């Protein structure tokens, strides 16, 4: 089983939201949203040559995957803007469902993370936008 197959298998068989596999890497998370990617990014971790599997990938997560150096991603659901990010930066992508945009959890509008980065063309500005949005959501504003 290669890293990609292992990541997809682990995601589908476990209770995980995000799995990254590679040489000496077996990263799993049950956290929702972009936190499973933002935390290792902020800790300076990089996953060059690794494969990832994720339940839902919007543009914010796609930017984080690019910054983390992931080589290939499987997504249960992926947004068109996220797919475009992966294509632009040469990250392999497989998915079950392609959607226009990622909705928020209550299905009343756009996901706040997707909205936070929708106008960005480069991944470098994404972490700051994501952290600002998380702080705003946490404060209830």
Predicted regions and their residues:
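C-terminal binding/interaction regions
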Residues: 68-71, 83-141
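Short, polar loop motifs at secondary-structure junctions
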Residues: 77-81
């Amino acid at each position: 089983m290669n890293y990609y197959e292992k990541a997809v298998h682990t995601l589908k068989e476990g209770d995980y939201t995000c799995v990254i596999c590679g040489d000496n890497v077996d990263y799993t998370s049950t956290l929702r949203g972009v936190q499973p990617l933002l935390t290792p990014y902020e800790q300076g971790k990089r996953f060059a040559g690794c494969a990832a599997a994720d339940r839902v990938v919007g543009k914010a997560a796609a930017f984080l995957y690019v910054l983390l150096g992931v080589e290939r991603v499987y997504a249960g659901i992926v947004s068109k803007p996220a797919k475009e990010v992966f294509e632009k930066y040469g990250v392999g992508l497989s998915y079950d469902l392609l959607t226009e945009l990622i909705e928020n959890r209550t299905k009343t509008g756009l996901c706040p993370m997707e909205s936070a980065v929708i106008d960005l063309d480069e991944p470098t500005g994404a972490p700051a936008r994501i952290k600002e949005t998380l702080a705003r959501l946490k404060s209830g504003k």
